[in-house]
Amino acid sequence: MTVKFINAKEAASMIPDGSTVAIDAFISFCLADDILGEIESRFVREGHPSSLSVVNVAGIGGDGKDRGINHFAHKGLMRRFLCSNLSLANKIYPLITEDAFPCFMIPQGVLSHMMRAIASGKPGIITEVGMKTFVDPRIDGGCINDAAKACDERPVQLIQLNGSDCLFYPAFSIDIAIIKGSKADKKGNISLEKEAMHLEQLEMATAARNSGGIVMVQ
């Protein structure tokens, strides 16, 4: 494992176009906002990184103005957005309604377990969670806008297991994981001792590493 100590601007420069980027936070708690801000600045300046497939487990709207996922409110920056809610993502709403990219919502618990599934190399999550809700493929399949309904990359499938209907949420690779910690040592071990919450930091980092991706920690 290669460990590098770099600044947020350098971290943003390492993200290729078309990457799948997973971001861990809960509203503004444990939010690596310096990195997200530098991603925005680089996109405004250079037009890169573009066409990112962005995943966040919980809502990361930050302050409801400029922080969190609001940094990504630029046409062309995202090509797909998978989340569990859009709490305080006020700048993102217009892009969703304008169909700037497909937006999908699936249950927060499923996305949380998905990080562990990806980390352990499982094919995905099989569960009844989401059945008979708008997440069910027989209803809306978690589609939030028309762009999502027209997209072939659906986050959930209806399957049968032992004669019963279930939902299958397929796993995916993570190219970049962005998390926040309190301290780091020279070996890359991260402490969360001053963070407000223990979220999916470990699972998301492991998922990215086992996908051959990069873990960025602010």
Regions of interest found by a model, annotated:
Residues 1-218:
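Conserved alpha/beta enzyme-core scaffold
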